[in-house]
């Protein structure tokens, strides 16, 4: 099997980032081997229907990962905090398992997705934001391991705030539904580094297509960079509901139904994410504006 015909092992292919990467690779003619825990699930079957090969494995089982990575030209890596007790330590453990498995299998390229600002976060976790230090430390620690692992080629993708979090079905910003308006601790003038998840897949596919050009690239990825007032205007147009950018206290947001996971938003008022669209454009990456994303994904919900 030549390198060009070898598959890319995609972690999280049934999720947002891995799914976007699997679709982008398949569209470009690259074979995809999707790591799944249960190939019988509807989500796994949907990935298979796109043309991906399913391989059973678990990020907590290094041997299963080594088997899954055999013969792969690259690995796309994504992990989330372990919600079953290990928290951010579990996220790091899973990343280490995947990195070590890929090295043991002789995979030459590793593309990992992290988060904007990881590794540049010392100021972000000072004072009232110290509770976020474990989150950023885990992301930065995984990045360090990727750099030091010895892959022939590696790339770090560091995306900003997902546009997908602006869907009406997501309680982070619409806990009361569209009619209840936006609920956020972000100030109207705060600019968000927004990312369309499909653009993460576009970057990953570009890195696989040109591993030497993307070797060592640490891309602070944003598809758009808008204030909350501008975001509200775009959403209003697509949803057909007049929305404004609120200026809420934490107490007001809590009373409006914002879940606890939304509290970290306020950090971005003081420490914006460094991701910017011009970084991806400099690499020739086509991007999706919020207006384009909203037109494609929100109009049917209006």
Question: Across the structure, where does each feature detected by a protein language model lie?
Answer:
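Short beta-strand-to-loop elements that line the ligand-binding cleft
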Residues: 244-247
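Generic hydrophobic, helix-prone segments enriched in Leu/Val/Ile
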Residues: 47-49, 182, 261-266
């Amino acid at each position: 099997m030549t390198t060009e015909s070898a598959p890319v092992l995609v972690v999280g292919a049934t999720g947002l980032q891995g799914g976007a990467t699997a679709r982008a690779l398949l569209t470009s003619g690259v074979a995809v081997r999707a790591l799944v825990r249960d190939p019988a699930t509807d989500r796994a079957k949907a990935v298979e229907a796109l043309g991906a090969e399913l391989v059973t494995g678990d990020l907590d089982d290094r041997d299963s990962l080594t088997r899954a990575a055999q013969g792969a030209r690259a690995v796309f890596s994504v992990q989330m905090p372990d919600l079953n007790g290990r928290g951010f330590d579990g996220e790091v453990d899973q990343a280490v398992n995947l990195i070590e498995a890929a090295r043991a299998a002789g995979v030459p390229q590793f593309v990992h997705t992290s988060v904007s600002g990881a590794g540049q976060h010392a100021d972000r976790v000072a004072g009232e934001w110290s509770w976020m230090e474990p989150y950023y430390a885990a992301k930065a620690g995984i990045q360090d391991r990727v750099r030091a692992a010895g892959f022939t080629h590696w790339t770090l993708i560091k995306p900003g705030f997902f546009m997908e979090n602006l869907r009406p079905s997501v309680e982070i910003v619409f806990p009361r539904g569209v009619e209840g308006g936006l609920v956020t601790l972000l100030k109207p003038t705060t600019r968000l580094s927004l990312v369309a998840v499909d653009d993460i897949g576009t970057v990953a596919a570009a890195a696989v297509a040109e591993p030497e050009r993307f070797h060592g690239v640490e891309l602070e990825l944003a598809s758009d960079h808008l204030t909350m007032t501008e975001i509200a205007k775009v959403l209003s147009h697509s949803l057909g509901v007049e929305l404004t950018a609120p200026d809420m206290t934490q107490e007001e947001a809590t009373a409006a139904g914002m879940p606890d996971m939304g509290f970290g938003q306020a950090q971005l008022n003081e420490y914006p994410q460094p991701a910017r669209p011009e970084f991806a454009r400099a690499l020739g990456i086509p991007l999706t504006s919020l207006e384009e994303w909203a037109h494609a994904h929100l109009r049917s919900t209006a």
